[in-house]
Amino acid sequence: MRIAFVCTEKLPIPPVSGGAIQIYIEGVLPYLSKHHDITVLSLKNDNLPDEEVVDRVRYKRLSGRTKSEYLNNLRDNISNEYHLVHVFNRPLWVMPLNQQAPGSAFSLSLHNEMFLPNKIDRERALKCIATVKFITTVSRFIADGVKGLYPIAEEKLNVVYSGVNPSLYKPIWLEKHLPERKELRKKYGLDEYKVILFVGRLSQKKGPHVLVEAMKSVMETHPKTALMVIGSKWYGVNTTDIYTQQLQSMTESLKGPVVFTGFLPPAEIPKHFSIGDIFVCTSQWREPLARVHYEAMAAGLPIITTDRGGNAEVIRQGENGFVVKDFNRPEAIAERIRYLLDNKHIAKKLGMSGRKIAETEYNWERVANQLLELLTAYSGQAARGDRGRFFRLIRLNTPQRAVPGRGAALKP
């Protein structure tokens, strides 16, 4: 089947500047391209050719100084030659692209709350839902949000959790990885400290300021503790704004060392996870489900996260981490950090459990296989001219499984 992946206007593929959606796409392509002829339409980048074929995947990179320019270029590159057009995170684009290629089927991959009234009006939302053959979401939280606003969408919703490549991450408890861990920690002056790790964009909604506040009391009781902050204001750049400046100023009062790495290329992220002892995600917004949780699990780190959006769906309380209900209270975060610092055996057990979960449940092969089930079911029905039965086939033939930590049933 010939498939077009329509990527957002934000960042290019492959993820040379990072980005959760971009990493997701790169992760599944090696598996999907073995079964389907895939063209990836993404944003132009000075460091990448406008067109190329890599590992059976065709890439076409389009200019897009504005969202409208990018959409126009997408329309110029979409035609009925594709059996399926899979649109990432832009329900508003489904109808304009469908008008350009009325002979193609469409599907949608949701990574944010893109069906909220401030994102799309009701008329276009309903047209989008009616047009697409299926919708995948990265969390139950996102799926439930769509269903709550548009119950008619329920038959088309499929939760497909994201993934990670565990082989890129080096669990901190394995002896063979200790030399590289020690070398990196020494490079940053952290070799004598327990390192609390934050990875993500430096924005108020990601909550690093809450972690800094929490570290004030942690460092009072545990002076051999350090904070490492990996990330920048935006993907691929190291410019600052008022928030990042205030954040750095806040750390000046901390008694222990603090390291801001700035933006790191995606290829550098896995080894930097090995520097940490405890991973903390302090999201303050309705996070769809931050992919850093998968990365922390792969690195074998115990996780402390806030109960925001879909984050809790991949945390099994007391098994691979802890979910903090009081998401905006620094002391609630600090209490969990101190608990893990004081109970090293529990921290190690959580980290080892998380690594196992990442290996068995949150790898890219599992993500790709779930997508292949949807694609295969659709292509089979389409070939027989019976597309109307597609949704019932998916619901009847897809096994149920429980949401980690929640116990609710879902379609994978």
Predicted regions and their residues:
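Nucleotide-activated donor-binding/catalytic signature segment of Leloir-type glycosyltransferases, i.e.
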Residues: 241-263
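Short alpha-helical donor nucleotide-sugar binding micro-motif in glycosyltransferases
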Residues: 263, 271-276
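A short, well-ordered alpha-helix in the C-terminal region of glycosyltransferases
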Residues: 332, 339, 346-360
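Conserved donor-binding/catalytic core segment of Leloir-type glycosyltransferases
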Residues: 4-6, 136, 185, 190-206, ...
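Short His-centered aromatic/hydrophobic patch
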Residues: 87-93, 110
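Short hydrophobic beta-strand element within catalytic cores of glycosyltransferases
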Residues: 302-305, 315
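Acidic donor-binding loop of glycosyltransferase active sites
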Residues: 274-288, 301
